[in-house]
Amino acid sequence: MSFFHASQRDALNQSLAEVQGQINVSFEFFPPRTSEMEQTLWNSIDRLSSLKPKFVSVTYGANSGERDRTHSIIKGIKDRTGLEAAPHLTCIDATPDELRTIARDYWNNGIRHIVALRGDLPPGSGKPEMYASDLVTLLKEVADFDISVAAYPEVHPEAKSAQADLLNLKRKVDAGANRAITQFFFDVESYLRFRDRCVSAGIDVEIIPGILPVSNFKQAKKFADMTNVRIPAWMAQMFDGLDDDAETRKLVGANIAMDMVKILSREGVKDFHFYTLNRAEMSYAICHTLGVRPGL
């Protein structure tokens, strides 16, 4: 082995050693639509639960059937794994009384952590009657929930400006939110600048970075285009020519995610939220390499 490659290996080992034992993880899942997808979900939950995440969250659909599945999955996770399970709850398609009923049901079933979101506006709809900050207030009135909210390092697509978006986050925190979880991003500097702006605005809760391990670049680009997330040119180049090579795409995506975690860890970030897309393989491998392992 050449001196160059040996030094590269030593640098990588040192970098990973700095992270091991220093980070916490959480995972997001979504309600499956078919029995086959449900089996994949539970296989993923079972595998990732062995990593002892701080919590797992389950997204909340825009229709009653999907909302019911969220409730069922959350309760199943709690009963099956004992993990802290945090349902997403949106206020765009429910009345305050309905939201209170849902919140009380969660509380009575031992669910203490909720991810409070406004939700996506239906096409052609006007100004919403409730915002996420209103939902946080409502939840705190029902019970002393532990509440996570969303944050957008690269600005929410509907925000009038970056400052307006930041003030919206502050309203959610002032209403009682305990932490913010960011939209996924690929430019680490965008997160660090956003964190600095949060501090300057008096937002004193933890800003947990959302990490999306990319195995399908075209799908990730579609997500990014919808959510105002910039894909750096270097990242697009890394996936160039891999449309028909799924295994190499996974390796590339895992390395990008690991590099992001290592850099952010050096900047003092301790908690990371992984968007799993209901697949355990990449998130598990990334966590394993970073030292988050069963029994540790």
Curated annotation (Swiss-Prot):
The impact of changing F223A is: Strongly decreases substrate and NADH binding
Q: Which UniProt keywords apply?
A: Amino-acid biosynthesis, FAD, Flavoprotein, Methionine biosynthesis, NAD, Oxidoreductase
Q: Which GO terms describe its molecular function?
A: FAD binding; methylenetetrahydrofolate reductase (NAD(P)H) activity; methylenetetrahydrofolate reductase (NADH) activity; protein-folding chaperone binding
Specify the domain of life of the species encoding this protein: Bacteria
Its EC number is 1.5.1.54
Which pathway or pathways does this protein act in? One-carbon metabolism; tetrahydrofolate interconversion; Amino-acid biosynthesis; L-methionine biosynthesis via de novo pathway
Task: Report residues binding NADH.
Answer: T59, Q183
* Entry's Gene Ontology cellular component terms: cytosol; protein-containing complex
Q: Where does FAD bind?
A: Y60, A62, H88, R118, G119, D120, A132, Y152, H156, A159, D165, N168, R171, K172
Signal peptide limits: none
Question: Could you tell me how activity relates to pH for this protein?
Answer: Optimum pH is 6.3-6.4.
Record GO biological process: methionine biosynthetic process; tetrahydrofolate interconversion
Consequence the record notes for mutating F223L: Slightly reduced enzyme activity
Q: Which reaction does it catalyse?
A: (6S)-5-methyl-5,6,7,8-tetrahydrofolate + NAD(+) = (6R)-5,10-methylene-5,6,7,8-tetrahydrofolate + NADH + H(+)
Any other comment in the entry? The reaction proceeds via a ping-pong reaction mechanism, and the two chemically and structurally distinct substrates can therefore occupy overlapping binding sites.
Cited function: Catalyzes the NADH-dependent reduction of 5,10-methylenetetrahydrofolate to 5-methyltetrahydrofolate. Is required to provide the methyl group necessary for methionine synthetase to convert homocysteine to methionine; the methyl group is given by 5-methyltetrahydrofolate. Can also use NADPH as the reductant, but much less effectively than NADH.
Similarity annotation: Belongs to the methylenetetrahydrofolate reductase family.
Q: How does it assemble?
A: Homotetramer.
Full protein name: 5,10-methylenetetrahydrofolate reductase
Query: Gene behind this chain?
Result: metF
